[in-house]
């Protein structure tokens, strides 16, 4: 598999919960361009004299979940699961009712791609609602937007890694520190120059 490309959503994971089937063609990274203020001068027509960065580019993925079994509705929208009276162990829900208060799914998300990479988001907030058309050619769906926020420790908002070799820090739902990555890169360059 060529790892020079990122494509195909394999799974969306919240903590260790795998969110159900994603509607074909609905997943969009929804990338936002970086913003900058352009300072222009009368004496320099045609081009700015200074560009001041305002914000980095960001992502806010959107997607539709079409697997609307009761447990998935409960996990993604909140509310209450209902069980038959004889189901004392509450194994097989027979219904779901919507929540009275807003559900906040906030925490670590992993977007595992078919191409062999994963997008790791330490601090995401999933906003979702029940939507779709009830026809014989479409299904109801849970319409989702995953907002990416800065982690509490001020580290990077997201990162891309090989799915088979996720960083050790991800065990604690954190990304490697930028300084550690830079130091590893310098050490790697020094080792390469000594070999040559």
Regions found by a protein language model. Give the residues of each.
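Solvent-exposed edge beta-strands and adjacent loop segments
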Residues: 1-73, 125-141
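Short acidic, glycine-rich loop/turn motifs
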Residues: 13-14, 111-115, 150
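An acidic intrinsically disordered interaction segment
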Residues: 21-31, 104-116
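Extended, positively charged loop/linker patches that create polyanion-binding surfaces
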Residues: 77-113
């Amino acid at each position: 598999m060529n790892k020079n490309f990122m494509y195909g959503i394999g799974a969306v994971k919240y903590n260790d919960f795998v969110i159900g089937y994603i509607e074909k063609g609905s997943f969009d990274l929804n990338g936002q361009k970086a913003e900058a203020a352009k300072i222009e001068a009368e004496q320099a027509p045609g081009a700015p004299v200074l560009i001041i960065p305002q914000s980095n580019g960001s992502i806010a993925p959107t997607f539709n979940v079409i697997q609307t079994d009761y447990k998935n509705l409960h996990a993604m929208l909140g509310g209450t699961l209902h069980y038959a009276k004889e189901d004392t162990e509450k194994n097989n829900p027979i219904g779901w009712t919507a929540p009275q208060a807003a559900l906040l799914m906030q925490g670590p998300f992993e977007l595992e791609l078919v191409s062999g990479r994963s997008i790791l988001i330490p601090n995401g907030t999933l906003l979702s609602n029940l939507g779709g058309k009830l026809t014989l050619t479409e299904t109801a769906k849970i319409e989702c937007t995953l907002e990416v926020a800065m982690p509490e420790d001020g580290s990077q908002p997201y990162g891309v890694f090989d799915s088979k070799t996720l960083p050790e820090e991800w065990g604690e739902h954190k990304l490697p520190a930028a300084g550690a990555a830079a130091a590893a890169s310098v050490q790697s360059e020094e080792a390469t120059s000594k070999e040559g």
